[in-house]
């Protein structure tokens, strides 16, 4: 795996890249995570023939925070990464806030994507009916609860204390200093979703406190080419809690988005 940096004005973003000639998959971490939280996905996706790239957004482990007066957008930074690595088109796989960045990118640059996988996410939809639903799911005091309670399902916390400890260690290391809130480039509305002509996989855990299955079904009503998978015994971090089921669902979806050699590199990696 190659460790590198994307140069941006006033900062650098850290990435890991397996290299190879396979169709690229770019992994976008949760709002509390970093590229390190994909340790259960990078190997299996690469073994299935993909070039796998994970990166840390601004202020997350390995990446600079950058100037506060020029925060840019998460989707703009993803475009810079894709251009830097010579990716003409790629699969985007985002979890939680990473899926919001992926969706924002898809709305701005649909021609750069082969597919979109949106996992365990509130998706940043700004419609009043959806915002009211979100508020019902997260009552006052929710954000004061321990991180592992909010982000990991009860089945995983009961069955895998060592996995919880590993997750907590990576989470604690993920944001070493100040945090930066980057705006989105697009208003993520129902109309915007309806206009998106891309294959989309919606994945969530059956015990996700942020985005339970009915939320996923609501998104699917507005995405013309959406598929849905619910991961059993998983919370808001399904990729970490149930990686075998998560990876199987993702690989099945990716496999059906065209076959043959990948011809989308702008330049050699």
Describe each region flagged by the PLM:
Residues 9-64:
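Conserved HGGG/HGGXW glycine-rich cap/lid loop of the alpha/beta-hydrolase fold
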Residues 40-43, 47, 53-94, 248:
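Active-site loop/oxyanion-hole signature of alpha/beta-hydrolase fold enzymes
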Residues 94, 98, 102:
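Gly/Ala-rich beta-loop-alpha elbow adjacent to hydrolase catalytic centers
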Residues 103-108, 113-143:
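Flexible "cap/lid" loop of the alpha/beta hydrolase fold
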Residues 126-128, 132, 140-195:
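Conserved alpha/beta-hydrolase catalytic His-Asp/Glu region
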Residues 196, 202-204:
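Short beta-strand/loop motif that positions the catalytic acidic residue
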Residues 207-211:
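Acidic catalytic loop of the alpha/beta-hydrolase fold
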Residues 226-269:
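Catalytic active-site module of serine/aspartate enzymes centered on a nucleophile-bearing elbow/loop
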């Amino acid at each position: 795996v190659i460790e590198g940096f994307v140069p941006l004005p006033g900062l650098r973003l850290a990435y890991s890249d397996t290299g190879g000639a396979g169709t690229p998959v770019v992994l976008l971490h949760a709002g509390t995570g970093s590229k390190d939280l994909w340790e259960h996905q990078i190997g299996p996706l690469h073994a299935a023939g993909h070039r796998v790239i994970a990166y840390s957004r601004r202020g997350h482990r390995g990446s600079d925070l950058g100037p506060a007066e020029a925060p840019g957008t998460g989707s703009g930074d993803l475009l810079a990464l894709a251009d830097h690595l010579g990716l003409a088109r790629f699969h985007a796989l985002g979890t939680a806030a990473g899926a919001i960045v992926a969706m924002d990118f898809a709305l701005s640059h649909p021609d750069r994507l082969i597919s979109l996988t949106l996992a365990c996410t509130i998706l940043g939809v700004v419609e009043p009916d959806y915002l009211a639903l979100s508020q019902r799911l997260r009552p006052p005091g929710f954000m004061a609860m321990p991180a592992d309670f909010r982000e990991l399902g009860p089945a995983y916390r009961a069955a895998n204390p060592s996995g919880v400890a590993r997750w907590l260690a990576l989470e604690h290391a993920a944001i070493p200093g100040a945090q930066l809130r980057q705006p989105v480039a697009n208003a993520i509305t129902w109309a915007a979703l309806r206009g998106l002509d891309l294959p989309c996989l919606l994945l969530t855990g059956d015990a996700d406190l942020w985005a339970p299955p009915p939320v996923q079904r609501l998104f699917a009503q507005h995405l013309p080419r959406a598929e849905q998978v619910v991961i059993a015994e998983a919370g808001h971090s399904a990729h970490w809690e149930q990686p075998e089921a998560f990876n199987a669902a993702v690989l099945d979806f990716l496999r059906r988005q065209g076959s043959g050699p990948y011809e989308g590199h702008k330049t050699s990696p």
